UniProtKB/Swiss-Prot annotation:
PANTHER family: 2-METHOXY-6-POLYPRENYL-1,4-BENZOQUINOL METHYLASE, MITOCHONDRIAL, METHYLTRANSFERASE
Name assigned to this protein: Ubiquinone/menaquinone biosynthesis C-methyltransferase UbiE
Keyword Methyltransferase: yes
Family under the similarity heading: Belongs to the class I-like SAM-binding methyltransferase superfamily. MenG/UbiE family.
Catalytic activity: a 2-demethylmenaquinol + S-adenosyl-L-methionine = a menaquinol + S-adenosyl-L-homocysteine + H(+); a 2-methoxy-6-(all-trans-polyprenyl)benzene-1,4-diol + S-adenosyl-L-methionine = a 5-methoxy-2-methyl-3-(all-trans-polyprenyl)benzene-1,4-diol + S-adenosyl-L-homocysteine + H(+)
GO BP term, example: methylation
Annotated organism of origin: Citrobacter koseri (strain ATCC BAA-895 / CDC 4225-83 / SGSC4696)
Top-tier EC class: transferase
Coiled-coil features, chain-numbered ranges: none
UniProt-listed HAMAP family: MenG_UbiE_methyltr
Primary gene name: ubiE
One of the record's GO molecular function terms: 2-methoxy-6-polyprenyl-1,4-benzoquinol methyltransferase activity
Length: 251
């Protein structure tokens, strides 16, 4: 129960106290960590791999650079960035959830991604890095779970180097109305059933669907990035806006 004096936010469609949301989100990802990759493939029919490849292509990351893969989970982007930056570069896979971080570390080590990757448990709202550290920051399917998104965007801006760029890959608002209706039906009826069968957890995937609907749409997120200090902010609608990639620069 939320007391009248408490600051509130949303957890899916629920209204909760701000200090409760992080723990509630943590419970979701502790629950789904072991099935996260399998569920991503099933939920998106494998298309998430194309969305992530497009993000890599838009990142401009080069050999010798330093990259932060924030809310990096099981490390799909980190693995690709590790190859791009080479031995003279560095990639930090950061996630607030220790279960997801453990899965990412084990997965990447098993496929031989070692040497230029470090793992840090970190809250996006208060990143534990010095100012002007990173050439590029990505946050992939993570921003919608952050309690105070504006604070997190300012934190990302602070740790970017001048000339650096932020890429936010996230579920968004479909731009074709018939697709939007079909997407709603899939998200709220089929997705929880898949979660129940594969991960034995319908509730976490019901939260996923609800959190997507509560996330800012394309233009709202663009404005939020601009308010945080980012310049030349643009976005690309992927799969007719089911997902959007936002990119902004620190000059």
């Amino acid at each position: 129960m939320v007391e009248d004096s408490q600051e509130t936010t949303h957890f899916g469609f629920q209204t909760v106290a701000k200090e409760q949301k992080a723990d509630m989100v943590a419970h979701v990802f502790h629950s789904v960590a072991s099935k996260y990759d399998v569920m991503n493939d099933l939920m998106s029919f494998g298309i998430h791999r194309l969305w992530k490849r497009f993000t890599i292509d838009c990142s401009g990351v080069r050999r010798g650079q330093t990259v932060l893969d924030l809310a990096g989970g099981t490390g799909d982007l980190t693995a690709k960035f590790s190859r791009l930056v080479g031995e003279t570069g560095n990639v930090i896979l950061a996630d607030i959830n220790d279960s997801m971080l453990k899965m990412g570390r084990e997965k990447l080590r098993n496929i031989g991604v070692i040497g230029n990757v470090k793992y840090v448990q970190a809250n996006a709202e208060a990143l534990p890095f010095p100012d002007n550290t990173f050439d590029c920051i990505t946050i992939s399917f993570g921003l919608r779970n952050v309690t105070e998104k504006e604070k997190a965007l300012r934190s990302m801006y602070r740790v970017l180097k001048p000339g650096g760029r932020l890429l936010v890959l996230e579920f968004s608002k479909p731009i074709i109305e018939p697709l939007s209706k079909a997407y709603d039906a899939y998200s709220f009826h089929i997705l929880p059933r898949i979660g129940s069968v594969v991960a034995n957890d319908a509730d976490s995937y019901r939260y996923l669907a609800e959190s997507i609907r509560m996330h800012p749409d394309q233009d709202t997120l663009k404005a939020m990035m601009q308010d945080a200090g980012f310049e030349s902010v643009d976005y690309y609608n992927l799969t007719a806006g089911v997902v959007a990639l936002h990119r902004g620069y620190k000059f």
